Amino acid sequence: MDALKNNGIYSIFPESESSYDLDTTVNKLVSEIEARSWNVSFTHDLQQTMKKHGKDVLPVKVLAICHSSHSGQILEKDHERVISCMMPCRISIYKKSDGKTYVSRMNPAMMSQVMDPLTAKVMQGAAADVEEIIQSALKTE
């Protein structure tokens, strides 16, 4: 694990510990997503998917989320559509063997450094929104 932290994977895929259980964390995230006019287009239950294929893993749910003001700017232009493979944004909620719940996401702001100005601006804006959603959802009451 220290080797992963040392090689920078956590700067590409930031991880936050949740003080809530997995289902509560998912529900808090969905509430924040919807309150900010984002949409949950799909929830992937990777534990159930793996179980269908004979693998037993700890719970993992991935929220696929989108906001048309961000995605529309990319999808309206032919040149930018190439990054649609990274869409929609994803937030992963999972348990680890320590029994705690964690939230991870991709850091598109890092990738935006090699993008054209419009794509970089959109990616940075979406990343900021997603980070606000996560931080707000993980706040303890």
Tell where the protein language model's regions lie, with residue ranges.
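Short glycine-enriched loop/turn motifs at secondary-structure junctions
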Residues: 8-10, 34, 55-58, 96
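Short intrinsically disordered coil segments
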Residues: 78-81, 106, 120-121
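Terminal, regulation- and interaction-focused segments at domain boundaries
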Residues: 1-40
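Beta-strand/loop substructures that line and gate deep hydrophobic ligand-binding cavities in soluble
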Residues: 90-116
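Short secondary-structure transition/capping segments
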Residues: 84-97, 134-141
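Well-ordered alpha/beta subsegment
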Residues: 114-141
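Short beta-strand element of the conserved SAM-dependent methyltransferase core
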Residues: 14-16, 63-66, 93
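Compact, glycine-rich, soluble single-domain proteins
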Residues: 36, 42-49, 53-89
